[in-house]
Amino acid sequence: MAHQLIEGQLAACVQIQEGVYSIYRWDGKICEEKEVLLSAKTIADKWIDISSFIKIHHPYDLPELIAHAPEKYEAHYGKWVESEVK
């Protein structure tokens, strides 16, 4: 999925964090799962495209999709992200 986000110019960078262990309630049951956390560096205009892509390709019925808007970022980095996703 990370490669597809980059190849499709939906994200400039995707960080993959393995070893995430989640405990949650689903359909009335307590579930425990090993998961992988993906963080995609992109722009706000790509939110709908990225969330739609993940909903189609993710094995979960309800994947966690959260956007964090940066309070500040280095200008050259921001320009690089913008150039990679257009």
Please tell me what each predicted stretch does.
Residues 1-86:
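Positively charged, small/polar-rich N-terminal and surface patches that mediate targeting and assembly
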